[in-house]
Design a protein with these regions (language model features):
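Conserved, mostly hydrophobic/aromatic
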Residues: 15, 32, 68, 96, ...
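Canonical Radical SAM [4Fe-4S] cluster-binding loop centered on the CxxxCxxC motif
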Residues: 1-13
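Ferredoxin-type iron-sulfur electron-transfer modules in oxidoreductases and energy-metabolism complexes
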Residues: 13, 17-20
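Conserved SAM/AdoMet-binding glycine-rich loop
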Residues: 24-147, 158
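Glycine-rich phosphate-binding active-site loops on the catalytic face of alpha/beta enzymes
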Residues: 164-171
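Radical SAM enzyme [4Fe-4S]-AdoMet core and its adjacent flexible, acidic
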Residues: 41-62, 109-112, 172-203
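Terminal RNA-binding accessory module
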Residues: 180-269
């Protein structure tokens, strides 16, 4: 946030018009992208929340799927969770960056939430949308991170059981307070922690992905498969990739696909 500058919100009418144009062109899925979508609308002349914007987009004929990212845990509202619960179009996937499971490190990062708030939020989301896929971002080796802090992160990973996680080794970023902090962590310690985290994340991801094998689910076909011309590639509502036999005329269509085999990060259908 120090480097990216202040949030700015596009006018809702402008967004709706663009979505309507896309729908008229045959687009069935849209992605709403923002540094923090949950802060949307606060600086508009006529304030509108992100939850209200989603409700308006839901009304657009032709749009079958709505995705959004990124959601900052500090201001993901109960209203947004309620809209997700009642929506027929919002995809069953939420990217909810954790960064660290240690409340002490989160405070140093100026994240404005703590471990307890994050876990309570996950419980609320799962109660509202039980089949939602949760993904996250985690940084290992932030200045001052102790072994106890790292274990707090591992504890959150085990409790939340993410469908997948983007794991990063901390690197100094010019213009951020952390770049000049003392207590920079030795590289060998960071590497060892990163490897432990990655192993845990991958184990949980594989267990969760395997649970869908054998089910028939809706897949939006996105493209011809790059490796095998007899296959097309699509995506489940939960954002998982599926490869299946198909032809180019299927691109842009939503089809029911039986998931025959889980290959770790993708399915064969």
């Amino acid at each position: 946030p120090y480097v990216r500058g202040r949030d700015r919100s596009r006018e809702p009418k402008e967004i709706i018009r663009e979505v309507e144009r896309l729908a008229a062109d045959g687009v069935v899925e849209i992605m709403l992208l923002g540094q923090n979508v949950n802060s949307y609308g606060k600086n508009l002349e006529q304030p509108m929340t992100f939850a209200q914007l989603l409700q308006e987009i839901e009304k657009v004929d032709g749009i079958e799927r709505i995705r959004f990212m990124t959601s900052h845990p500090k201001d993901l509202s109960d209203d947004l969770i309620e809209v997700m619960k009642n929506s027929k179009k919002i995809c069953k996937h939420l990217h909810l960056p954790l960064q660290s499971g240690s409340s002490r490190i989160l405070k140093l990062m100026n994240r404005r939430y703590d471990k307890e708030h994050y876990l309570e939020l996950v419980d609320k989301i799962r109660a509202a949308v039980p089949d939602i896929a949760l993904t996250t971002d985690i940084i290992v080796g932030f200045p001052g991170e102790t072994e106890e802090d790292f274990e707090e992160t591992m504890d959150v990973v085990r409790k939340v059981r993410y469908d997948s996680a983007f794991t990063f080794i901390y690197s100094k970023r010019t213009g951020t307070p952390a770049a000049v902090m003392e207590d920079q962590i030795p590289e060998d310690v960071i590497k060892a922690r990163f490897d432990r985290l990655l192993k845990e994340v991958q184990t949980i991801s594989a267990e969760k992905a395997g649970a869908l094998t054998g089910q028939t689910l809706s897949v939006l076909i996105e493209e011809k498969n790059e490796q095998d011309a007899s296959l097309v590639t699509g995506r489940l509502s939960n954002n998982s990739v599926v490869h299946l036999p198909g032809t180019e005329d299927m691109i842009g269509k939503i089809v029911n696909v039986k998931l025959l085999e889980c290959k770790g990060f993708y399915y064969m259908g």
